[in-house]
Amino acid sequence: MSRNTPHIFTSESVGEGHPDKVADYISDSILDACLAQDKTSRVACETLVKSNMVIIAGELTTKAVIDPEKIARQAIREIGYCNRQDDDVFHADTVFFTNLLTEQSPDIAQGVDAREAEGKGHAEQGAGDQGIMFGFATNETPELLPAPIVFAHKLLIELARRRKRGHVDWLRPDCKSQVAVAYDEDGRPAHIENVVISTQHTEDVDHDTIYSYCVKLIKNVLPAELLDERTEYFINPTGKFVVGGPHGDSGLTGRKIIVDTYGGMGRHGGGAFSGKDPSKVDRSAAYMCRWVAKHIVAAGLADKCELQVAYAIGYPAPVSIRVDTFGTGKVEEISIENALENIFSFKPADMVEQLNLLRPIYRKTTHYGHFTNPELPWEQLDETRLASLKQLLH
């Protein structure tokens, strides 16, 4: 990942109205509704959207009394698919809704629950599944995230802000962005090679208007020092994008895991986030790994850091932990790994406590990456832990 020669790295983002993100948002909205009433809720909610249909399926164990259909329609309305003229197929008020949620398997529950069970051997909360999770951080941006994914997200955040404020009346919810960043010999962002924006629009706007509007937006949002006459702009390259969202393509929870994380620059264990409560280490451990990697970089122990953990279902402690600083470390990686054991805990119950995860905060994660919102707990640095890590430099 760390390279000594100039190179280009590209990442993409997708907007709130992208069909996969519509599905993610419905799943996270149902999760939050459960946690708002019952913080011990076990939720694994998958959503499929296509044409004028919404189907939810998965496992749900909760004392909360919720109306999944009402929640789904409200989520769709918040995204913006509620215009009678333009949303004649996929509309918040008229979609057909199917609920296939069932209760969590008791075999899975006994492994996760903080109680003894035959063959379990302990009474601690165990991991909800086996698997590997990664966290990543780099000091190339203030967010401690890779520049390409940060830039791609920022473009769509601004596009959505303008759409929702009525800046222009032709913008619609479905959109995508892509940014190619050239890195210099030191591995720092040096130039933006090209930018792609594809945005859904109404029928009554011409391509030239969309092109000039989006190029101006790009120049307002991205760092001016990285843009010049060599930068290429690809705006709605197909020429027309009227049919979008679930009307144009099917959407499914968990299909934008690279957009949700590091834009491809950091590894991904394969487990999606949306619709899963914190007992699922796919979500909680990935957040924890991001939090720890961010502390390692913020403490000055490395310019770039990736953390991997692995779990066995039903067991509380990770079966392995690995730190990789890609040759940018100021101290030995084994020293960092040893220090982590005393500063952080990767047991499922401890991760939930350290990050205060049993709250309805997950709708805030769905859009524009799970690691871009400074209000979220895994994006906030703990000064005591930071100071402990800095001791390794002395």
From Swiss-Prot:
Its EC number is 2.5.1.6. Mg(2+) binds at D20. Pathway: Amino-acid biosynthesis; S-adenosyl-L-methionine biosynthesis; S-adenosyl-L-methionine from L-methionine: step 1/1. It catalyses: L-methionine + ATP + H2O = S-adenosyl-L-methionine + phosphate + diphosphate. It is found in: Cytoplasm. One of its GO terms (molecular function) is methionine adenosyltransferase activity. SUPFAM superfamilies: S-adenosylmethionine synthetase. Pfam families: S-AdoMet_synt_C (PF02773), S-AdoMet_synt_M (PF02772), S-AdoMet_synt_N (PF00438). GO terms for biological process: one-carbon metabolic process; S-adenosylmethionine biosynthetic process. Binds 2 divalent ions per subunit. K(+) binds at E46. Residues 104-114 are annotated as: Flexible loop. Keywords: ATP-binding, Cytoplasm, Magnesium, Metal-binding, Nucleotide-binding, One-carbon metabolism, Potassium, Transferase. It comes from the Bacteria. ATP binds at H18, D174, C175, K176, K240, F241, D249, R255, K256, A272, K276. InterPro entries: ADOMET_SYNTHASE_CS, S-AdoMet_synt_C, S-AdoMet_synt_central, S-AdoMet_synt_N, S-AdoMet_synthetase, S-AdoMet_synthetase_sfam. Catalyzes the formation of S-adenosylmethionine (AdoMet) from methionine and ATP. The overall synthetic reaction is composed of two sequential steps, AdoMet formation and the subsequent tripolyphosphate hydrolysis which occurs prior to release of AdoMet from the enzyme. Homotetramer; dimer of dimers. This is S-adenosylmethionine synthase. The gene is metK.
